[in-house]
């Protein structure tokens, strides 16, 4: 009996968190009341206070349980550590954008982060949330350094500056799409968007591994992908 009550309590807590995500994304954090959350979760306001002391505590609980995007998409990736690191990075970026476009919960979370929240001192900071849910800078840095060591991109690339550029590009794309998701199809255009971003890197070698990507519909060979990036950078035609 005690175990059942504990499970029911945990279920109610999660109901409140999911309801809060929906309400925050729609109304904004500041405009959402505890009553709004209780009504959306179909529980009493008293049930909220059994689990949370304030709206800020619910907000913090949302992000504390959120997995990093890199972990969420891990099982969807086809390339391994032995494959071309630039193409692996490309696949991760594309899959991440497509996940955001396809999953309403992920979309709602980012809507809250980018457009529906004014942070206060009792809330997890925007910086901490970004660090918690995004791609790890050390992982991206390692991927770029591997590309340099394997002569895929120029050794003159400033890795730290490139990370700043990547963050700016992806934040801008996601923010603009969230403001008006009818303005472009993020899911369909994710490959072209990522290729345009990676085209800022001076690629100096075309990967010889034509088998890096599987033959599923929509996949492009590594040679064609790398050639596309080089052509986008130089302005030369892609023949």
Please name every model-derived segment:
Residues 61, 75-106, 159-166, 206-207, ...:
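Hydrophobic alpha-helical connector segments
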Residues 1-27, 31-43, 56-57:
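Basic, helix-initiating cap at the start of DNA-binding domains
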Residues 88, 101-130, 209, 213-214:
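Amphipathic alpha-helical segments used for helix-helix packing
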Residues 99-102, 115, 119, 142, ...:
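Amphipathic C-terminal alpha-helical segment
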Residues 1-11, 207-239:
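N-terminal intrinsically disordered/low-complexity leader segments
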Residues 71, 75-76, 83, 87, ...:
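Amphipathic alpha-helical packing segments from all-alpha helical-bundle domains
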Residues 24, 33-34, 45, 55, ...:
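Amphipathic alpha-helical segments enriched in hydrophobic/aromatic and basic residues
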């Amino acid at each position: 009996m005690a175990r059942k009550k504990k499970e029911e309590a945990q279920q109610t807590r999660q109901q409140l968190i999911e309801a809060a995500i929906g309400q925050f994304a729609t109304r904004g954090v500041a405009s959402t009341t505890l009553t709004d959350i209780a009504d959306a979760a179909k529980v009493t306001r008293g049930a909220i206070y059994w689990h949370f002391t304030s709206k800020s505590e619910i907000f913090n609980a949302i992000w504390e349980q959120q997995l990093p995007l890199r972990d969420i998409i891990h099982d969807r990736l086809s390339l391994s550590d032995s494959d071309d690191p630039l193409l692996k990075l490309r696949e991760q970026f594309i899959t991440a954008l497509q996940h955001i476009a396809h999953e309403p919960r992920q979309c709602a979370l980012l809507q809250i982060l980018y457009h529906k929240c004014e942070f206060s001192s009792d809330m997890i900071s925007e910086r901490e949330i970004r660090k918690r849910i995004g791609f790890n800078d050390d992982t991206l840095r390692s991927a770029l350094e591997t590309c340099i060591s394997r002569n895929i991109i120029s050794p003159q690339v400033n890795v730290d500056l490139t990370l700043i550029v990547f963050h700016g590009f992806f934040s801008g794309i996601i923010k603009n799409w969230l403001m008006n998701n009818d303005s472009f199809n993020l899911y369909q255009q994710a490959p072209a968007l990522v290729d345009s971003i990676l085209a800022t890197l001076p690629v100096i070698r075309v990967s010889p591994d034509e088998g890096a990507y599987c033959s599923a519909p929509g996949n492009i060979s590594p040679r064609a992908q790398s050639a596309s990036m080089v052509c986008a950078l130089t302005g030369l035609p892609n023949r």
